Amino acid sequence: MSSLETIKKSLRNYLPTSVNIDDFIKAEMTLALLEKCKPEGDPTKAYLLLHNYSLLGEVVCDETAFLLQKAHRLLHSCSSKMNWAKVLENYRNAQSEFCLYIFTEKIEKGSKILKFARNTELAVEPDRADVYFKYIRKHKEDRHFEYAKGGEYSYSIKDKTSSTVYSADVKIPDRTPQMPISPPPKKTRKKISVSTDELLASAVEMAEKKPDDYCYSILKSNTLKAVTEGNVKSANRLEIDKITNLVGMVGSGKSTLMKVLSYHLAKADKKVLLVLDTVSSVLEMCSYLSQFGVSVSPVIGRSGREKYIDQVAKAHEKYLQNEYSKYLTAPCIIDGMAKNKSDKSSVPMFGSEPCRSLMKNKKHYNCPYMDICPAVRMYRDVYTSNVIVTTVQGLAAIRLLGDNKLFLEYVLEQADLVIFDECDKVQKTLDEFFTPSASFDKFRQNAATLCSEAMNKETEALDGMEKNESGYIRKLMRSLGVCMAVREAISAYGGTWRTILSRTFSAEILYQAICRENQKNKYISDKSLEHMRRVTIGLDHDKDIEHILKFALSEDDIKIFSSDISDWLTDNNCKPDKTFSDHIKLYLVVAAFDNYIREISDSYLFLPYERKTQQELTDFLSTRFTAQQKILPSSAMGNLFGMKNDPQKGLILYRQYAFGRALMDRMPWLRLTDEGQPAGPNVLLLSGSSWADGCLQYHVNVPVKYLLEAEEWKRRKIAESKMIDLGTAIRVSGSGSEEREENLTEVIKKIMGTIEAELRSEGKLLMIVNSYSEAQTAANYLNRLLSNGKTVACMCREADEFDENMILRSEIADFSDHSADIMVAPAQAIERGYNIVDKDGHSAFGSVFFLVRPMEVPDEISSKCTKLNGYLERHCVLSGKKNAFDRAAKLRSEATRQWSLMERQGKMQLSSLDPVMKLDVTASLFVLILQIFGRLCRITDESKPAPRVYFADGAFRRSEKNTAGYDLLNELIDYLDSMIDNKETGKIAETLYQPFYEAFKKGVEKNEFADISDDIYSEEEEF
């Protein structure tokens, strides 16, 4: 059989030199995959096979799944609809007698359809499809990197307080680093099986090494139960095979189990990864496990080290603990060797070390001291540690040193077990992580500094500016005019598109809307429209359309722009009405804006390292997740770029890169064997609220295999909790931004008697709002009303201006020692991840007041994306599709349909939502309320009062006049009833939620009403 190189050489002898051989072969590889999966499939949609969609829905484990997974990596550039159209067109234009496939066009149901078939008369390399498949299966990506040899190098140091960049020179002796070498990738992982007795024995060992450790007492007092076909019974063994979902209510010992299991497996020389919520949690876990002799290390980002130091530094201590300092404050060897540094550039540059940016002759080199440098020790320790601890972001994005491999790739190849704590939050975080968004208006404001610096340069400095940088600055200087041109075009040309433009949109969406209009009225030929589109995306050239695009983003040239469009329409025999003409104009403006953003993105990538600034949009543009896209399934609607015109925030840009949650719930299958069997690590999912059927964001679609049940007395105590509807008629949530602050203070004023009574009870008070600004408003108002020395603290971000009435988010775990009696916090910031307890481990809070209905902003792009992913996992049945092509096409069409539905319902009344989306709202609010309630349920002292929960916002109830309106408290009762009464999964819900359910039903009656009407499904202010 021939090799791929032989085929390339043969084709070069026959094909014209104008044909790109690599693209030619990519086209044939992709078509060969389509032929294998569905010979009668549409070749223009063959790119759908390159998205790794076999992992979604019911996972397919066969040889074809492995082949497609490898093709997803190798042919990733062809997975784009636009790129594939270019590659396919160029292939069709090549000489057909040398092509593996030939094409015919047929008319079916009035539409032109492209068909393809094998060229049976092919004389040159006729067996090359088999060669392609072999090459795809065996392909491995090469990584090219080079260490600095002996000689003179330079590197840059950024002043973190300004945009100033300093340079330093260093002379490096010749040395070759002895970097750790990763062993060969592991094959399929054996299931992990450990008995409860073995876990208890390991917990005893931990207690012997550290007598005050609590793991044994907690593990012994809680009960592990197995779930089999809806039946629940006690289990004496924990088995983790591929992916295992273990749930348990707050206080059931999930974190304890994670610690003991990590210790137990480390003794057996297993490689375990723990994925936690915050960097401080990561560092604390490493410090904890190291006390027992476990070989453990963190993997965290480099750029935030100064912030991490503040988070783990203990009050009144002069030095960090060694477990922290060896990773956070270690010096850089190169920095110590540097010469001609200025005073300002001589400070420790934590997180900005030149590990990959030593410069010589305009080329970057890796530091030759990576193998011994203290500053990057944590990335070397990955290779030798039994237990590695990281965050979601660390797992998804960090690269290891040396060969620059993704840490995720290393985990897929080497880890025996990955444990995701709070897995329901993890999946939401992953979905949002791979759907970044950015404000173009903020970018425009930030660009002013760089443009001002350039304008103030002396002539000599301006002449000496690097070409890429000067080009980038010129593009930035256009940003104000571009922003105004786009927003004014939306206002002037929107016409009947008001609905479309109120949602997320892109040039492609506008083009499809134009095509629909044209089908009704036939203003212009379909051929002319398609030609216009092809020019805007670079598939064709047309000097007239390109001239129009040149003036599309210039306010000063609006007359030229309009005149040129009129001329082009006339030349194409088009006599449109004003609305259609305006829509053409708006499409071209948005298409030109797309191109402008791509130009900025490309220019930024080629900037010198020292001139790259950390700004929201530049991060958005430069973070392309290229390596991650080759591992994860693509976004269900494709890796899209789009925008939203927000009246308050301006132009918001967004991208969808990947089906984020697959990193967690499909991890064992992210690497497949040749036979299609999972070759990734085993996964253990832990959470107290991941079983919330109907919740698109938080429900984890992995069957529950184990339950962890807390002690009976704790369940009884939680069931004794007081749930009280305060019955206020004042609605905070859903009110307009003008009334919202006033309504919030009115609610506080009305319930002040209850607040003062709670202050006389045991425990501190927690007040829940929806944003940091609301927290500030509520805290200030409460401090004015309170007497007897009682005080309030509001949670604030790290970057906020700090005063004595604030508490940093990173410090709230120590609130029991704070002087304040009340803490006001945004729901999304405190819902989980913090055990706010006293010295005995009992919750610092005795009661919680929901001053608002704790909803996130439902019309946020990232929120809709995670809901879409949840919907597709739960409702898009793909198992009935026999081949990968049909599965991919079904997924894409269903995703598009559901996204459109969510866009339409974004501003609807809650009571008007379709059943799936309405259930999602209820289930999501339940999870949020339950998690916040969990801050009160850390119970160690049975003698203390049970928690108290107050619902203060009138928006928890519907209007008495609107009996069909949305009543959250009624809906929660119905939702809990349906889960507890479910014959198949009721036992799971009972174990998790029965105590909350009992307390809620005792305290909250159905059919109570507020006296103000239901409002729209939208919150004005975002968390």
What are these regions (language model features)?
Residues 2-203, 567-595, 599:
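N-terminal accessory nucleic-acid engagement/regulatory domains that precede
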Residues 238-261:
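Walker A/P-loop
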Residues 270-271, 277-386, 481-498, 505, ...:
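A substrate-engagement module of RecA-like helicase motors
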Residues 271-283, 758-782:
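Conserved strand-helix element at the start of the C-terminal RecA-like helicase core
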Residues 287, 369-386, 390-594, 683-712, ...:
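Signature of the SF2 helicase/ATPase Hel1-core->accessory helical subdomain module
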Residues 301-306, 660-747:
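Interdomain hinge/linker at the junction between the two RecA-like core domains of SF2 helicases
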Residues 359-416, 426-427, 610-677, 824-826:
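Conserved helicase/translocase P-loop NTPase motor core
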Residues 377-385, 791-824, 837:
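Conserved motor-coupling elements within RecA-like helicase/translocase cores
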